[in-house]
Amino acid sequence: MLEKYLEISKEVSEALKENKPVVALESTIISHGMPYPKNAETALNVEKIIRDKGAIPATIAILNGKLKVGLTKDEIEYLGKKGKEVVKTSRRDIPFILAKKLDGATTVASTMIVANLAGIKVFGTGGIGGVHRGAQESFDISADLQELANTNVAVVCAGAKSILDIGLTLEYLETQGVPVVGFGTEELPAFYTRKSGFKVDYRVDTAKELAEALKAKWDLGLKGGMVVGNPIPEEYQMDYDTITKAINDAVKEAEEKGIKGKESTPFLLAKVKDITKGKSLEANIQLVYNNVAVASDLAIELSKLNK
């Protein structure tokens, strides 16, 4: 049944059969996260980092109505060039993108779904979605959070994107029973900065310790993922006050223009990039590189435990 929809590359398929470490990657970061050719270059560098670490990258996207797990260089270039013409696809969109045989860029939520269908348990990305500022009125809450509650995939990220309400995001995750872990930190990172002012549930200092906690969670049938907050490397983090002001200005502009829903995150990130004269984009790229390195280590440790 699944073969009709799911196409796993030979390399990824063989790695999974042999219990080799595999790291899932999303494609919204390629189509909506940055301009071409930077987006394709970054995606290929990310794959190289994972390979150098000793794991196998599995970039996930929907191409011509097929859920693809593991993309070729040409497919990554294609997504990079098409950019925002590709539909940003979350859980609710998958059935229609498949039925209409369209191209779709997977978000954190839909990447988790497809990774789980393929049997991949670790996913490295930039930041997760969350509760938007003002959600008390708008109810704008990313589907990523519900996915983390339901789907058994660990997500290594630099925290929640700082354009969000981090406090409310953590409250939501707590209600859903999703552990929020700091990798080498007591505090949840805030994407562009190492600190957010919010404590994590647990601090973990090694990938081995993380893998053991995940194995225990899933062995007990406690469904859902885990948020692994991995701070941006110090030399690339942005000045807290500068980035906070840039975000506040961007949020204000989005409100004035009535930008909401799935359009809001790409708009806010692009605005912050303009305000910071491109510095936020460089920070974004570096934090992704850092996250996939940790995700690779975690995938390696998990595969050892599952031998």
UniProtKB/Swiss-Prot annotation:
- Example of a GO biological process term: nucleobase catabolic process
Enzyme Commission number: 4.2.1.70
Query: What does the Swiss-Prot or TrEMBL cofactor note state?
Result: Binds 1 Mn(2+) ion per subunit.
> Reaction catalysed by this chain?
D-ribose 5-phosphate + uracil = psi-UMP + H2O
Q: Which residues form a coiled coil?
A: none
A Pfam family annotated for this UniProt entry: Indigoidine_A
Q: Which GO terms describe its molecular function?
A: hydrolase activity, acting on glycosyl bonds; metal ion binding; pseudouridylate synthase activity
Entry binding sites for Mn(2+): 140
Q: Which GO terms describe its cellular component?
A: cytoplasm
UniProt KW keywords: Glycosidase, Hydrolase, Lyase, Manganese, Metal-binding
- Asked if the Swiss-Prot or TrEMBL record annotates the protein with the keyword Zinc, the reply is no
In the record, the note on similarity to other proteins reads:
Belongs to the pseudouridine-5'-phosphate glycosidase family.
Assembly behavior:
Homotrimer.
Can you say what this protein is called? Pseudouridine-5'-phosphate glycosidase
Annotated source species: Clostridium botulinum (strain Langeland / NCTC 10281 / Type F)
Gene giving rise to this polypeptide:
psuG
